[in-house]
């Protein structure tokens, strides 16, 4: 029979493991166990008060399964951090975490990955590694380029009102607009969407004419809207 010393106390018998003390400053963790999300969804940790020791908070966020998943931390506010995996989560899997000393988990669905190719004027969607649809698209014009990088679906709106004043363009400016837009899939909080744009169908596949959004035909936008969910990745490449 083994004797194990833990924190100054002595336990006799099987090896004892100290129960982790939960971080009471953690208010919520997303995704929750009840959610099935896309393979690019970040882990979002909200704290009750602003975090002064960010390094300690980051150390308390650990991926248990799958093993060897690494990522980066993005503090979007003094009390909210996003853990963004370097690689996409495995599809159709349970992801297990430790956050603030407490176990958490969520599930991923299919791997629905969209690639917007700015120079090829295409928007290609693969589901579980198989190309499901390649669509002609129009991205941001030179003055309003679509940002390059990997993004995730933040929400869906059908319809949504898009107003150029929210990005600093007055309505009476030649570039001004206020439009009701269908099948809008948000990929940045700054206002970049993938959406239906019947007015630019003639340019889709040939030229980039938008104010930064990814324009699709109504039919293609509806298909994407109906096949995409929160956390699905959108990769914009030059």
Region annotations inferred by a language model:
Residues 48-50, 66, 76-78, 86-88, ...:
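Solvent-exposed coil/turn segments that connect beta secondary-structure elements
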